[in-house]
Design a protein with these regions (language model features):
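Non-heme Fe(II) oxygenase catalytic core, chiefly the N-lobe of the double-stranded beta-helix
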Residues: 2-278, 288-356
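Conserved acidic residues
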Residues: 281
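Short beta-strand segments
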Residues: 284-286
Length: 356
């Protein structure tokens, strides 16, 4: 029988799932776990028995994969009709862009059969790293954190040499809920400024991967995103990713630093570092109001990362499309970009909600 228990320190926003048998799990049972994950934000499924192929078959039942870099790439080059090889072969595309595309391909991107599942690994084949975030620890971050239309969920399946490393989680909802009504109202109005800062997520990252992270994390300088947003399940928390936030709109640099440091101090207690117990553990987590990090020995470590929308769960949980923001013009900017991304992903046979 499946056993579900709370993860320590996360104040009810995280669960362990044990004794799950994917070979005999019904579709309804799996979808129910998906709805639970949306509401709990962090789910750690121990000892899954999944490999990269079965992982993709299972996780895509919750939602379609999305990589904003790939979608916006095709929007910039519509004549390529979604064919990355045409972009690489074109004389109209800069060599810098081509290097980033090749890096994205090398770590598993641009592969529709696997849902753009990316490898996270320091392993090398013929002297080349086969995955992104190859070496060392990763500092607190969320993916696409400086993108107004960030992808809201991440699934990470272990594969090889995982048990000397940890993945940590920081949930922001309990901190936000602990504040006074007046302070929450102040935070609700605040806008953070995001920029890509080399080395802020993975100190010592090699140049090609740094360029890929720039496109992935914060493609446009001085992007404005509200501090307080809601998760796909409607949970309010902070979209405060340490790796891309460089200031608060309307505040001086010194005041921003003091304010953001106070937030970091308040959030620090709502963290949990999961030291992988099995190579095939599966971690599924919110990417809107939760940050994550990596600790420990990453030598020859290999895992698979699937980034996705809750395409087949969203209406079951909230009865409406997911829009993180209540403030304008950010709500409209999100809708516009999501419609553009949805249009570009039609070439992959994907159908995203039309936002109005």
């Amino acid at each position: 029988m499946i056993r579900i228990t709370d993860i320590p320190n996360l104040e009810g926003y995280g669960v362990f799932v044990d004794n799950i048998d994917f070979k005999h799990l019904s579709r309804q049972e799996w979808m129910d776990l998906g709805k639970l994950q949306m509401k709990k934000l962090v789910m750690i499924i121990r000892s899954t028995g999944l490999d990269s192929r079965s992982f993709h078959q299972v996780i895509k039942k919750w939602g379609q994969d999305r990589q904003n870099y790939a979608a916006t790439l095709f929007a910039r080059y519509p004549w390529a009709n979604g064919q990355v090889d045409q972009i690489i072969a074109s004389t109209e595309v800069s060599e810098e862009e081509k290097k980033i595309i090749r890096e994205f391909q090398r770590v598993g991107g641009c592969n529709q059969k696997t849902g753009n599942t990316l490898r996270v690994s320091g392993k090398k084949v013929n002297g080349q790293r086969i995955g992104m975030f190859a070496d060392g620890e990763l500092l607190w971050h969320s993916n696409e954190s400086g993108d107004i239309a960030f992808t809201p969920a991440v699934a990470l399946l272990g594969a090889e040499n995982m048990t000397n490393s940890a993945t940590g989680f920081m949930v922001t909802a309990p901190y936000y809920n602990s504040l006074s009504d007046s302070f929450r109202s102040e935070l609700d109005e605040m806008i953070l400024i995001h920029n890509f800062v080399p080395g802020k997520i993975n100190p010592g990252l090699n140049e090609p991967q740094d360029n890929l992270m720039y496109k992935n994390m914060c493609p446009d300088p001085d992007t404005e995103i509200p501090l307080v947003i809601q998760s796909p399940a409607g949970i309010k928390g902070l979209h405060y990713s340490f790796n891309t936030v460089t200031g608060v709109k309307g505040m001086s640099k010194s005041d921003s630093v003091r304010f953001l440091n106070d937030l970091k101090w308040g959030l620090a207690k709502y963290t949990y570092d999961y030291w992988w117990e099995n190579d095939d553990d599966l971690l599924i987590f919110d990417n809107s109001i939760v940050q994550h990090r990596r600790l420990g020995d990453t030598t020859n470590r290999l895992c698979h990362r699937y980034q996705f929308d809750y395409t087949y769960l969203q209406y079951k949980v909230t009865k409406q499309n997911y829009i993180p923001y209540s403030q304008e013009p950010y709500r409209s900017r999100y809708v516009d970009k999501m419609n553009m991304i949805g249009n570009m992903l039609k070439h992959e046979g994907k159908s995203f909600p039309v936002f109005v």
